[in-house]
């Protein structure tokens, strides 16, 4: 067992959106922070979202129908946080126009006033004007939409983003301010002082194959769907707080959507809504919402896929089949238990708990409110005298890594021998940091592509190892460039090249390279 000599203020367990957000908030306030993630960063539900930064139009409908103030407050908070999100991560998050197909004039009036309330709630934080276009114009936008009884499209604006890139940006920003973040480090035991209060953790580093101990003033459990498992490890008598919900998404060719605007399907057979969204030159469809149990690597189930296909096909002339699916995935939402009969009805609010041994756990919430969740948690630590107050929260005005003005770099980027497709891909994935990738490619005189049918440079592999915490090939293919979320077959076609390039950089022997190829292909096969 190796011991760390230094005692830190905070150990965070979990490298998803909440853990990463807490790492940044706490570091900016002047605390020493170590974040430990048992797999890769964003390997859980945080990379398996609908990629929306939204106030929650569907939560507003529930608030009105059920006269539910909690749902209303969630929308209000979401709209406020959406504005901060888009400002601080403008390289990753963009506004998106979303169209709602309308098939009756009564529904037109109902939806129009719902969107009006949504816009009025946003006040000066609105992203754009709501609008209505008739049937003819709607069909021009979406030729495949079901035309019988179509009255037109009602449109509104929300935000969209690359969730896995947001995690990396948060972590890079936190590290630049002094945080230490480690992936593939699994906490397997808590340390306790003479008063039986938590004083640190024991963890196993899967890359170095070593056990370590670290002492801390506070240990935060931000492990998402695993929150209850860690709470029970601390206190076997504790009550579980999570109601786990699975949500799947499928990806098909962008031709199905035929525009850069999203579509919201407002009336499904079970009262949910489904989003069909442009996503990195593909089309993303989701989501489902079903009770589930904790699973390390959940996979989209047959019945969930059939549900999405059936509901989507009700709205389109040309039907989707399973053969059209290029990738699919399942994420587990860590919702907080309530008296609601279904997980879909549960309010997406968050909760912070302190155990009798001072383990601090946070659960619930949603991607859009990750920053507020982090702020609330660090403020909770100060209020409960677990940490001495230092600085105020600064995350409302902290621009994230890669968010410098890309326009100033455009001329410089144009000098490099890359295609327009590669240039756009680099800007989308790395923002202003794309110039670092290009400089690295230039230094090694290697502008070779990983695959001639894809925009990714081999130099991106080395950059992501040096700058973005990549330890395994699946980290790169799934959660740095996102290819696994787009096209499983294309991702599989890149495995050998990525493993061999990583082998050269990290000095793997042939046996290790072959082992990584096998493991990576097994992982990718989880994507449909």
What do these predicted regions represent?
Residues 28-49:
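Glycine-rich FAD pyrophosphate-binding loop
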Residues 9-35:
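N-terminal Rossmann-like FAD-binding beta1-loop-alpha1 element of flavoenzymes
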Residues 6-8, 208-218:
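Core beta-strand elements of the Rossmann-like FAD/NAD(P) dinucleotide-binding domain
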Residues 229-250:
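Glycine-rich beta-alpha-beta "Rossmann" dinucleotide-binding loop(s) and their flanking helix/strand
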Residues 25, 39, 92, 99, ...:
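C-terminal accessory subdomains/tails of enzymes that are appended
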Residues 183-199:
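A conserved short coil-to-beta-strand element within the FAD-binding core of flavoproteins
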Residues 51-141, 274:
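Dinucleotide-binding Rossmann-like beta1-alpha1 core, especially the glycine-rich loop
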Residues 13, 214-224:
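Short hydrophobic core segments
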């Amino acid at each position: 067992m190796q011991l760390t000599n230094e005692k830190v203020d905070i150990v965070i367990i979990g490298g998803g959106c909440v853990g990463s957000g807490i790492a940044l908030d706490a570091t900016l306030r002047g605390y020493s922070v170590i974040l430990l993630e048992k797999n890769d960063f964003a390997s859980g539900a945080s990379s398996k979202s609908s990629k929306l930064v939204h106030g929650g139009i569907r939560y507003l409908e529930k608030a009105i129908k059920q006269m539910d103030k909690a749902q209303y407050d969630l929308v209000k908070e979401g709209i406020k946080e959406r504005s901060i999100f888009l400002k601080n991560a403008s390289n990753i998050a963009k506004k998106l126009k979303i169209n709602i197909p309308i098939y009756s004039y009564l529904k037109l009036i109902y939806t129009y006033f719902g969107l009006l309330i949504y816009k009025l709630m946003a006040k000066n934080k609105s992203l754009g004007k709501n609008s209505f276009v008739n049937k003819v114009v709607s069909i021009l936008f979406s030729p495949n939409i079901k035309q019988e009884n179509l009255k037109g499209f009602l449109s509104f604006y929300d935000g969209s983003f690359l969730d896995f890139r947001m995690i990396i940006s948060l972590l890079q920003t936190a590290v630049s301010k002094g945080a230490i973040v480690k992936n593939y480090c699994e906490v397997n035991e808590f340390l306790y002082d003479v008063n039986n209060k938590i004083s640190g953790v024991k963890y196993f580093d899967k890359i170095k194959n070593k056990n370590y101990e670290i002492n801390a003033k506070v240990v935060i459990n931000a492990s998402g769907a695993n929150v209850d498992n860690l709470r029970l490890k601390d206190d076997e008598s504790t009550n579980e707080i999570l109601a786990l919900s699975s949500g799947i998404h499928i990806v098909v060719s962008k031709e199905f959507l035929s525009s850069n605007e999203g579509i919201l399907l407002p009336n499904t057979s079970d009262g949910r809504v489904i989003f069909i969204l442009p996503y990195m030159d593909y089309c993303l469809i989701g989501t489902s919402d079903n009770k589930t149990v904790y699973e390390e690597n959940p996979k989209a189930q047959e019945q969930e896929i059939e549900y999405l296909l059936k509901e989507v096909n009700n709205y389109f002339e040309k039907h989707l089949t399973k053969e059209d699916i290029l990738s699919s995935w399942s994420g587990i939402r860590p919702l907080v238990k309530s008296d609601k009969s279904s997980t879909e009805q549960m309010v997406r609010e968050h909760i912070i708990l302190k155990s009798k041994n001072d383990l601090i756990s946070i659960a619930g919430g949603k991607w859009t409110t990750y920053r507020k969740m982090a702020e609330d948690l660090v403020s909770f630590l100060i209020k409960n005298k677990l940490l001495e107050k230092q600085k105020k929260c600064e995350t409302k005005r902290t621009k994230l890594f890669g968010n410098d003005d890309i326009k100033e770099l455009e001329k410089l980027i144009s000098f490099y021998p890359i295609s327009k497709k590669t240039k756009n891909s680099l800007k989308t994935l790395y923002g202003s940091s794309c110039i670092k990738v290009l400089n690295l490619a230039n230094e090694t005189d290697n502008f070779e592509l990983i695959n001639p049918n894809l925009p990714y440079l081999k130099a991106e592999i080395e950059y992501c190892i040096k700058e973005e915490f990549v330890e395994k090939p699946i980290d790169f293919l799934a959660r740095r460039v996102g290819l696994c979320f787009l096209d499983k077959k294309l991702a599989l076609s890149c495995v050998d090249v990525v493993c061999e390039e990583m082998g050269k950089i990290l000095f793997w022997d042939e046996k290790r390279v072959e082992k990584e190829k096998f493991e990576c292909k097994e992982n990718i096969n989880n994507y449909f």
